[in-house]
């Protein structure tokens, strides 16, 4: 029985994922998926997407530690980590996951604030007179 480790990232969220063959148990920050989410169905589907696409929701156990960012970024980091772990588990899953963009790191992050501006691009109000 081998244990596969993968890391998923999104914005400032980082997910460390361990995947082992098992009965379909999902543990995030030592809580079940429903406890961790608090009933957000859309976010739950986002996390479960790679498992549902590869039909592995009942045959692998996943233990994950997620930190940084908000719930949505954490869920997407978790999805990225699970996808990378499934790819390492069976290379045949790559043909399913790659076209859906689940193995690609979403590199969009918040643009930094510049001096002389109110935000990253928002300038102070301009007055001609």
Curated annotation (Swiss-Prot):
Molecular function, one GO term: RNA binding
Transmembrane segments: none
Alphabetical keyword list: Ribonucleoprotein, Ribosomal protein
Keyword DNA-binding tagged: no
Highest rank taxon of the organism: Bacteria
InterPro entries linked to this entry: Ribosomal_Su5_D2-typ_SF, Ribosomal_uS9, Ribosomal_uS9_bac/plastid, Ribosomal_uS9_CS, Ribsml_uS5_D2-typ_fold_subgr
Gene Ontology terms describing biological process: translation
Cross-referenced PROSITE patterns: RIBOSOMAL_S9
Record GO cellular component, one term: cytosolic small ribosomal subunit
Full protein name: Small ribosomal subunit protein uS9
Keyword Ribonucleoprotein: yes
Family recorded in the similarity comment: Belongs to the universal ribosomal protein uS9 family.
Pfam families reported for this sequence: Ribosomal_S9
Organism: Helicobacter pylori (strain P12)
């Amino acid at each position: 029985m081998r244990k596969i480790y993968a890391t998923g990232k999104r914005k400032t969220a980082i997910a460390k994922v361990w995947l082992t063959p098992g009965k379909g148990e999902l543990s995030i920050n030592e809580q079940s998926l429903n406890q961790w989410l608090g009933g957000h169905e859309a976010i739950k589907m986002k996390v479960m997407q790679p498992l549902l696409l590869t039909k592995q929701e009942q045959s692998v156990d996943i233990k994950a530690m997620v930190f940084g960012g908000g719930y949505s970024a954490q869920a997407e980091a978790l999805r990225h980590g699970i996808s990378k772990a499934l790819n390492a588990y069976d290379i045949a899953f790559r043909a399913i996951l790659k076209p859906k963009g689940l193995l690609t790191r979403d590199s969009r992050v918040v643009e930094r604030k510049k001096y002389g501006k109110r935000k990253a691009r928002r300038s102070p109000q301009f007055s001609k007179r």
